[in-house]
Swiss-Prot record:
It catalyses: beta-D-fructose 1,6-bisphosphate + H2O = beta-D-fructose 6-phosphate + phosphate. This is Fructose-1,6-bisphosphatase class 1. Substrate binds at D115, G116, S117, S118, N211, K277. Keywords: Carbohydrate metabolism, Cytoplasm, Hydrolase, Magnesium, Metal-binding. Mg(2+) 2 binds at D112, D115, E283. Mg(2+) 1 binds at E90, D112, L114. Signal peptide: none annotated. Binds 2 magnesium ions per subunit. It comes from the Bacteria. GO terms for biological process: fructose 1,6-bisphosphate metabolic process; fructose 6-phosphate metabolic process; fructose metabolic process; gluconeogenesis; sucrose biosynthetic process. It is found in: Cytoplasm. One of its GO terms (molecular function) is magnesium ion binding. The keyword Cytoplasm applies.
């Protein structure tokens, strides 16, 4: 039986689910960009791409060389094809409008070009996260200037989302709103090949991912929930749990997507004015869309992540996502 490449899968989606041709093209362009990023990541010190740039992004985080390289790759790959009206990235202060010399398309692309880049120098899995939105009609005119407001749509408006994970294998995880598929990069063939047909998150779990060093700063509901996990068989949950923490959202969520579990990056008392650490638009929303499409759930503790109306491009949010039963439990604790 012949293998199904990403291109073939997307063509079949166009035939069976009326996936628009320009959306299909957009996903293929992003996938090609991810292949190029994977190449740079895999070269490491041999390619002179390790270390920092000595600059900070809009988040106040030190930019790694590969952050900037990955951002440039995604911009250059997507700006000319006529499928986008604009882009936004963790590494750019403002929205990026497609240059006037290129045709303008109907979609917006939002991305974290290299999630987990603090792990690059120690050779831990990193990845690219992306989200696709429709551009509001008022910005589709070739003469209309695009601004941040065009992107401020709740996660329920996403038409596609995915991530590439650069680890022992390079994989692309994708949802078009009808389930979650996994594609593995065949380097000999040069294509992403469908290897995971229908990814589902188990409803129950015995694993969780959280940075325990921040425990003293957490709010009471999270303190309670994690305390119950750690109590094991003798505690109220009557089950032993294992903790895993990679400090790369892509890597942690990928493990939960394939093995079940709960990923938590809750707000804490260190910066009470900030509702969380992770960014809503290009981290929490795409990952929540994927997790929900795989049968899981996602919340900020009180509300479904995908229902949150963004107020700014780089808005932060508390994130708790993964196996549905566990998400519902910790949400109930927040509401007591």
């Amino acid at each position: 039986m012949s293998r199904v490449t990403l291109s073939r899968y997307l063509i079949e989606q166009t035939r069976s689910n009326n996936t628009p041709a320009d959306l299909r093209f957009l996903i293929e362009v992003v996938a090609r960009a991810c292949k190029e990023i994977s190449h740079h990541v895999s070269k490491g010190a041999l390619g002179g791409v390790l270390g920092s740039m000595g600059t900070e992004n809009v988040q106040g985080e030190v930019q790694k060389k590969l952050d900037v390289i990955s951002n440039d790759i995604l911009l250059e790959a997507n700006e000319w094809g006529g499928h986008l009206a604009g882009m936004a990235s963790e590494e750019m202060d403002n929205a990026y409008q497609i240059p006037g010399k290129y045709p303008k398309g109907a979609y917006l692309l939002v991305f974290d070009p290299l999630d987990g880049s603090s792990n690059i120098d120690v050779n831990v899995s990193v990845g690219t996260i992306f989200s696709v939105l429709r551009c509001p009609n008022q910005y589709l005119s070739q003469n209309e200037s695009l601004n941040e407001a065009a992107f401020l749509q709740p996660g329920t408006e996403q038409v596609a989302a995915g991530y590439a994970i650069y680890g022992p294998q390079t994989m692309l995880i994708l949802t078009l709103g009808n389930g979650v598929k996994g594609f593995t990069l065949d380097r000999e063939l040069g294509s992403f090949v469908l290897t995971h047909e229908n990814i589902r998150v188990p409803e129950t779990t015995a694993e969780f991912a959280i940075n325990m060093s921040n425990q003293r700063h957490w709010e009471a509901p999270v303190q309670r929930y994690v305390g119950e996990l750690l109590a094991g068989e003798t505690g109220p949950l009557k089950k032993n749990y294992n903790m895993r923490w990679i400090a790369s959202m892509v890597a942690d969520v990928h493990r939960i997507l394939t093995r079940g579990g709960l990923f938590m990056y809750p707000r804490d008392a260190r910066e009470p004015s900030k509702p969380g650490k992770l960014r809503l638009m290009y981290e929490a929303n795409p990952m929540s869309f994927i997790i929900e499409q795989a049968g899981g759930a996602s919340t900020n503790g009180y509300d479904r992540i995908l229902d949150i109306k963004p107020e700014s491009l780089h808005q932060r949010v508390s994130v708790i996502l993964g196996s549905k039963e566990e998400v519902e439990r910790v949400t109930a604790y927040h509401k007591e």
